[in-house]
């Protein structure tokens, strides 16, 4: 009805206004810091102080760059999801390719990245085991996996392990991204998917994350008719020994 259309439009306008206000707030913080550092640089008396101020400016530029990139991604999501044609995506090949890229470009200070794909019982006509297929946008699904792996890396020690696992759960394909980090505060298991969620691990380089990565994951997964959530991993003594992100997507060949 016309009333429903009006209410929907009002909600969309409110959402855009809220997002714009959030963006303005997030952009203002590094800009204010950068302006202060630039103004102070002129009066710095020692090279050590000048170096500290240049570091602050560099960090703020990194933060702005990350923010602008992720804001651009978010602003494109709705348009891409509503107009793009969903195609059959081979998740098995997608994950294998992405992990190969990580391993090929892996730096010494990164944790070990492991891939474990549980084979399907369903076989193709040529006798080979079928990969996992979903209907969707390959680029967006790849971004979900990349964001989750990058998030796991940021919470991991360089000698730690990250596990990416894929298996069937009923009529869904389940992707798990697990790390051996400090875990997630129990009261933040849902809010970590909010826009501009800002809690980061101690010691992480400033500006590496915008607080939008997990929100992008949720938007993409929701648009694919799936589900994403986070949980902690516990040992036998009920101590948190890591975090697990779970993505569920409808299988395309069922």
Would you name each region that the model predicts?
Residues 79-84, 125-136:
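Conserved micro-motifs of the catalytic ATP-binding
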Residues 14, 59-64:
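Short alpha-helical segment of the dimerization/phosphotransfer core of two-component systems
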Residues 85-100, 117-125:
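A conserved beta-strand-to-alpha-helix junction within the catalytic ATP-binding
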Residues 184-196:
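Short conserved segment of the HATPase_c
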Residues 152-153:
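Short helix-loop "hinge" at the ATP-lid/N-box region of the Bergerat-fold HATPase_c
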Residues 1-15:
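Amphipathic coiled-coil signaling helices used for dimeric signal transmission
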């Amino acid at each position: 009805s016309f009333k429903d259309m009006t209410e929907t439009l009002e909600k969309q306008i409110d959402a855009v206004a809220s997002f714009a206000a959030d963006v303005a707030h997030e952009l203002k913080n590094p800009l204010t810091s950068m302006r202060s550092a630039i103004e102070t640089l002129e009066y710095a008396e020692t090279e050590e102080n000048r170096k500290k101020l240049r570091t602050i400016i560099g960090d703020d530029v990194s933060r702005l760059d990350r923010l602008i990139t992720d804001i651009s991604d978010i602003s494109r999501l709705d348009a891409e999801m509503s107009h793009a044609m969903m195609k059959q995506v081979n998740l098995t090949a997608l994950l294998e390719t992405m992990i190969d890229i990580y391993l090929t470009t892996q730096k010494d200070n990164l944790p070990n990245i492991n891939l474990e794909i549980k084979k399907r019982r369903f076989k193709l006509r040529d006798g080979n085991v079928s990969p996992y297929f979903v209907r969707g946008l390959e680029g967006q699904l790849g971004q979900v996996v990349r964001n989750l792996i990058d998030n796991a890396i940021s919470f991991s020690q360089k000698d730690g392990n990250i596990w990416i696992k894929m298996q069937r759960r009923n009529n869904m394909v389940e992707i798990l991204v697990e790390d051996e980090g400090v875990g997630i505060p129990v009261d933040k298991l849902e809010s970590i998917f909010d826009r501009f969620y800002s809690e980061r691990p101690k010691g992480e380089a400033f500006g590496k994350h915008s607080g939008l990565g997990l929100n992008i994951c949720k938007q993409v997964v929701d648009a694919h008719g799936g589900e994403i959530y986070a949980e902690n991993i516990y040992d036998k003594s009920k101590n948190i020994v890591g975090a697990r992100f779970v993505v569920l997507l409808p299988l395309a060949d069922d």
